Regions:
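Acidic active-site catalytic centers that drive phospho-/nucleotidyl reactions
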Residues: 35, 125, 177, 215, ...
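Short hydrophobic/aromatic residue motifs in ordered secondary structure
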Residues: 38-40, 128, 244, 272
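Primarily NTPase-proximal linker/entry elements flanking Walker-type ATP/GTP-binding cores
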Residues: 3-124, 131-167, 171-176
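Conserved catalytic-core segment of NTP-binding enzymes
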Residues: 155-168, 184-289
Length: 290
């Protein structure tokens, strides 16, 4: 069973009689193991130690509140809400295996239930026939229309057709699934940049967003993935999948600190309903055990 960061902190307080340098060394290790990342962990602990000395802090909760104070600026929320009577395009990015296609379906159902008119899922991962089929199955189950071409087709043309369809119906939302073969990085980047140009042209002003899906259990790999996609096309928002507050989960802090990308949604399970609007305060409190 994985021990949460919050439990590790409680164990630290049980083991150490004083809030001293040895305590802060172990706090650094716990943050790194919690996927906050070494650089961010060292910076946070250095600042926390100085504040605790200055304020003469000796209680567990006070130390955690200092950490919360320091972490809060790095963890931000972005509201992704399509505008009525406008064409919105949300390009959903991520490596294979993070739950990207399922996340597209979860988001589509979320928007359908919240009253977004004319939502469409675009099967723009044309590299994998299985991805197209998977999205079509999700479409049948959620009642959300899917625009798809044959396997091997130009992904940008799929997004173009989906956006044209939405536009012809007076506006709505295109959620575009995309390829994630990071092992073939150069080809993938070129493909995404082409889709990016088309999506930007077809969406109404201010209605185009690039959303990166990351697996909350993959730690610093997720940060490296975010760096690649952010450099390629720019990322506006994160969806954190496979999130389990009892395990690691600190990667949103690392991405926020290093890249400044906010989080829109958090997914806690496989079901279509297992998606929620991200709440930074709840996330930080769960991470720290407050």
């Amino acid at each position: 069973m994985k021990i949460s960061f919050a439990q590790k902190i409680k164990n630290l307080f049980g083991f150490h009689k004083a809030i001293d340098s040895a305590f802060f060394d172990e706090l650094t290790d716990a943050l790194i193991e919690g996927d906050v990342g070494a650089k961010t962990a060292f910076e946070l602990v250095e600042k926390a130690e100085a504040i605790c000395k200055e304020r003469k802090i000796s209680e567990e909760k006070e130390v955690l509140l200092v950490l919360k104070e320091l972490i809060t600026p790095y963890v931000n929320f972005i509201s992704l809400q399509p505008e009525k009577d406008k064409t919105s395009v949300y390009l959903v990015l991520g490596v294979n295996g993070v739950g990207k296609t399922t996340t597209v379906a979860k988001m589509a159902l979320h928007y359908k239930k919240s009253g977004t008119q004319n939502s469409i899922m675009a099967a723009a991962d044309t590299f994998r026939a299985a991805a197209i089929e998977q999205l079509q199955i999700h479409g049948e189950r959620t009642g959300v229309r899917v625009v798809a071409h044959q396997s091997g087709a130009d992904p940008a043309s799929v997004v173009f057709d989906a956006a044209e369809s939405v536009k012809s119906h007076g506006g709505g939302l295109v959620l575009a699934d995309t390829a994630g073969r990071l092992h073939n990085k150069e080809n993938l980047v070129r493909e995404l940049q082409k889709i990016d140009r088309i999506a930007k042209q077809k969406a109404d002003e201010g209605c185009y967003k690039k959303i990166l899906v990351i697996d909350g259990t993959t730690g610093q790999n997720a940060l490296r993935q975010a760096e690649v996609f952010h450099e390629a096309v720019g990322v506006d928002a994160i969806v954190l999948t496979k999130y389990d507050s009892t395990a690691k989960g600190g990667v949103a802090i690392a991405i926020g600190k290093e890249l400044g990308i906010p989080v829109a949604f958090i997914c806690t399970g496989e079901g279509y309903k297992d998606i929620g609007v991200f709440n930074p305060d709840t996330y930080i409190n769960e991470f720290l055990g407050l």
